[in-house]
Amino acid sequence: MEKLVTAVGAMSGTSLDGVDVAEITTDGQKIASFGASAYHPYSAADHNILSLVLGKWPEEQGLETARGLIHQRHLEAYQMLDAAELYGFHGQTLAHDPRGRGTHQLGDGHVLAQRLGKPVVWDFRSKDVALGGQGAPLAPFFHFACAQWAGLNTPVAFLNLGGVGNLTWLNPSCAAPEEKAALLAFDTGPANAPLNDLMHHRLGQPVDQEGRLATTGQVDPKLLSRWKMHPYFFQNVPKSLDRDAFSAELAELADMSLPDALATAVGFAAFGVAEAVERCPIAPAALYLCGGGRHNLALCDAICAQVACPVQPVEAIGLNGDMLEAQAFAYLAVRVLRGLPISAPMTTGVSQPISGGRIAGLDF
């Protein structure tokens, strides 16, 4: 076994709710232990600043304030935990168009490395996109390590319910995640993003707590039937989504009551998950939920009603579903440091397993 490294990863997702930070100790292959974690929420003002730059590319104007905000909030989040040997910094995804302009995560690892005085791994997605991959999702290699850490030995699936849903099907009996039969991963469709946007725009609230409002609404079946014909659901896997890929469809919720709009968005998210599970190479023995969306009971109930396998939170196998993404970027940071692959043909569509990312501050 290589020397163990204690790393802290951070994730600011497309839901724009805050920064998760989490510590992990690993050699880049096996997980030795999980450490402390913390959540640093964005204020309403922070949310507004970031919302205004969604969709922008690096060469566009008006990013300076948001970039400074991302650096400051991540620094504050990192400092909520004890100092680590290495930091993983994903940045804030503003735009994702892997077959066109590429992918844009706001933030500079060099700035954080200077302020932390420790190496920072960042820019995890660009190399994958440059080599023909989707650049997403990147958590699957970590999910594979988690399944082995939990002692699983049959194919299962992990579903991250963030702004967008991401499914990872995995076979933990394989020796390494880059093996062809070990993983299949792709985005399922919208998840929390439209729900949170509806709550923010209509009520000025960040989330529909436990999906309470959604449970009082009625799904619009005609709208849902039409949305199911979106070209994304007919694309080959692996594939990935931008946060706003379904913005034209979701704009049709504007004239509905809030409960009905939420219920319809929940129904659409659940359909995307069910359609994704059907594409798994072998039916998963269980679907494990992580991410903020697993707290939305309306969404979880809708998913349970549409998939054939048992659905459980990842806490059922000893994991922290709120921190899995942050833990993933701590784990991936160590893999980048060691030159190990972080994506493969069956996770992003890249031509061969590759180690992406850049490392700032190696001289510290």
Predicted region positions:
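Conserved ATP-utilizing enzyme core subdomain
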Residues: 14, 18-32, 39-42, 176-270, ...
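Conserved non-catalytic scaffold segment of RNase H-like nuclease domains
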Residues: 33-69
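Phosphate-binding/catalytic loop of phosphoryl-transfer enzymes
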Residues: 2-6, 98-103, 118-205
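Glycine-rich phosphate-binding/hydrolytic loop that grips phosphoryl groups
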Residues: 12, 16, 267, 315-364
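Conserved nucleotide-sugar donor-interacting segment of glycosyltransferase catalytic cores
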Residues: 108-122
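Glycine-rich phosphate-binding loops at beta-strand->alpha-helix junctions
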Residues: 94, 284-306
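Short beta-strand-loop/turn "lid" adjacent to the catalytic site in phosphate-handling enzymes
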Residues: 57-109
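Phosphate/ATP-binding catalytic cores across multiple sugar-kinase/actin-like superfamilies
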Residues: 73-81, 259-283
